[in-house]
């Protein structure tokens, strides 16, 4: 019955889903603050060399696991076994913990614009404390089930896209009309300065171009199959890259790059636009603030519940306690959600110790979020490399090019991501205490805990169960496939003439 519901997503539907999953105006603001209009060509390159190939990698894993509703755990287990599948799924969850720290201050800033009409500036410590109370509230709401979350997020996302297109059209018209941009738009300004700081910011760019894993899972549901999927993904990637590039090119038409804030940058650029066209800025601030606040708060509620539910229900039973993974009547693991809340508290408070302003705090939080977000795709790429190296003969409906092409493409991506990860983990100008105790310390503690937790689980298994848990599923599939082929060969071999 389930099979009859497949192949129901049209090309335009997939294009819309891809756009909604990947594009965010806040990503334009974040990267403009560091790179200026030089982020414009970098965005386009990132979508071509990362987003499109990574989508195809995920699509191949989905094709490999087409008989199951595969997730990150299943994809990596198929090529690397259970241990690395758990580590990868775990990194996706703990990246989300850092994501909360960057999202919560934005919710506060946009609430200020929505209700006051301007950004009320708090100290870093006050911002962190308010963020903690806000996260406690969102955890409580998410555990209770948010019925209106889907419709609210859909409406606000549509409004944000409408605002984005409106800004591009109006800012472009202003430039064509002869306005002198606040910051120059020329070849020199668009040329990145290739240094260690730039390599660190590439993590922000790749994070902005992420979202492939949420789109590529639908490769089996697209009308026209894998060929149609590949065409749409390439078109989507180019479209998103162009939109990011054009937005980045026009973001400083009305507002200087140096004046933009990580928290309320979206409102700032629309305030500049409204001032140029003679529109009431206070009303514009409130409108954009309300739309942004609603979208951010909806995103907060969704991400508070969804990742923790997916992670704790996808991994094998026995790694965490039964009470931790038990679902309430709304389908949310309540205890795990509150554990998530208590972990975020020190992640919010520690960076305030070395931050003189909310802008400094946000720089640290976004940088660490971007650095951590490099790990899950990196593990998936390593799994894919192992798949093409050792198990490429496993039958599947879709492959990203030949074996050599797949290995070459993913090897380049692994090299880029490795450099970007280290450059963002050890950024220039950051406090050595922040780097040691937050950037490095946070990763060591979280990954070390995951490794220890899996070792305890593995020791509790029998030798046979441990063998099957750590065995890549692709290896089992290949052995079964070759066994079937050998049996078929025996059946089809002509019988030899026997001596009388």
Model-derived segments and spans:
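C-terminal membrane-solvent junction of multi-pass transporters and transport-like membrane proteins
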Residues: 4-5, 327-330, 374-425
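Membrane-interface "cap" regions at the ends of multi-pass membrane proteins
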Residues: 1-40, 45, 51-59, 67, ...
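Hydrophobic transmembrane alpha-helices that form the core helical bundles
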Residues: 56-60, 68-135, 139-143, 296-310, ...
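Helix-loop-helix junctions that connect adjacent transmembrane segments
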Residues: 7, 41, 121-126, 154-289, ...
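Membrane-interface loop-to-helix entry segments
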Residues: 111, 128-180, 210, 233-238, ...
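Membrane-helix boundary/coupling elements in multi-pass transport proteins
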Residues: 91-106, 216-218, 279-322, 377-384
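Helix-loop-helix connectors at the membrane interface of multi-pass transporters/channels
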Residues: 77, 104-127, 163, 221-225, ...
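TM-loop-TM module centered on a large, flexible mid-protein loop between adjacent transmembrane helices
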Residues: 74-75, 81, 235-301, 320-369
């Amino acid at each position: 019955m389930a099979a009859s519901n497949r192949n129901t997503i049209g090309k335009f539907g997939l294009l819309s889903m891809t756009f909604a999953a990947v594009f965010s105006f806040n990503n334009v603001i974040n990267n403009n603050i560091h790179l200026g209009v030089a982020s414009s060509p970098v965005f386009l390159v990132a979508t071509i060399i990362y987003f499109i190939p990574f989508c195809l990698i995920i699509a191949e894993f989905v094709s490999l696991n087409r008989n199951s509703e595969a997730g990150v755990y299943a994809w990596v287990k198929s090529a690397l076994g259970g241990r690395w599948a758990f580590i990868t799924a775990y990194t996706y969850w703990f990246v989300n913990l850092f994501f909360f720290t960057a999202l919560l201050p934005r919710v506060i800033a946009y609430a200020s614009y929505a209700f006051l009409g301007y950004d009320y500036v708090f100290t870093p410590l006050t911002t962190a404390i308010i963020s903690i109370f806000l996260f406690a509230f969102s955890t409580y709401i998410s555990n209770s089930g948010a019925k209106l979350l889907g419709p609210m997020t859909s409406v606000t996302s549509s409004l944000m896209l409408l605002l984005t297109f409106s800004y591009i059209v109006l800012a472009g018209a202003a430039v064509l009309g002869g306005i002198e941009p606040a910051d120059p738009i020329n070849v020199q300004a668009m040329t990145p300065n290739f240094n260690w700081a730039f390599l660190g910011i590439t993590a922000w760019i790749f994070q902005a171009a992420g979202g492939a894993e949420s789109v590529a899972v639908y490769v089996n549901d697209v009308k026209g199959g894998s060929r149609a999927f590949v065409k749409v993904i390439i078109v989507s990637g180019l479209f998103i890259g162009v939109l990011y590039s054009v937005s980045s090119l026009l973001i400083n038409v009305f507002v200087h790059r140096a004046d933009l804030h990580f928290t309320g940058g979206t409102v700032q650029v629309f305030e500049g636009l409204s001032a140029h066209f003679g529109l009431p800025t206070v009303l514009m601030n409130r409108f954009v603030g309300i739309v942004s606040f609603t979208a951010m708060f909806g995103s907060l509620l969704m991400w508070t519940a969804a990742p923790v539910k997916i992670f704790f229900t996808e991994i094998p039973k026995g790694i965490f306690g039964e009470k931790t993974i038990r679902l309430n009547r709304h389908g949310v693991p309540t205890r795990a959600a509150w554990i998530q809340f208590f972990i975020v508290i020190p992640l919010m408070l520690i960076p305030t110790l070395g931050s003189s302003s909310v802008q400094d705090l946000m720089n640290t939080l976004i940088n660490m979020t971007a650095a951590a977000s490099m790990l899950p795709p990196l593990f998936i790429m390593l799994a894919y490399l192992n798949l093409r190296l050792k198990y490429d003969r496993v039958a599947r409906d879709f492959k990203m090019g030949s074996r050599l092409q797949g290995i070459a493409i993913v090897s380049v991506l692994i090299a880029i991501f490795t450099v970007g990860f280290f450059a963002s983990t050890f950024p220039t100008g950051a406090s050595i205490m922040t780097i040691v105790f937050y950037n490095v310390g946070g990763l060591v503690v979280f990954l070390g805990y995951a490794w220890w937790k899996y070792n305890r689980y593995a020791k509790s298994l029998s030798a046979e169960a441990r063998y099957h848990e750590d065995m890549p599923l692709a290896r089992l599939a290949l052995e079964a496939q070759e066994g079937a082929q050998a049996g078929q060969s025996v059946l089809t071999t002509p019988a030899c003439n026997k001596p009388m």
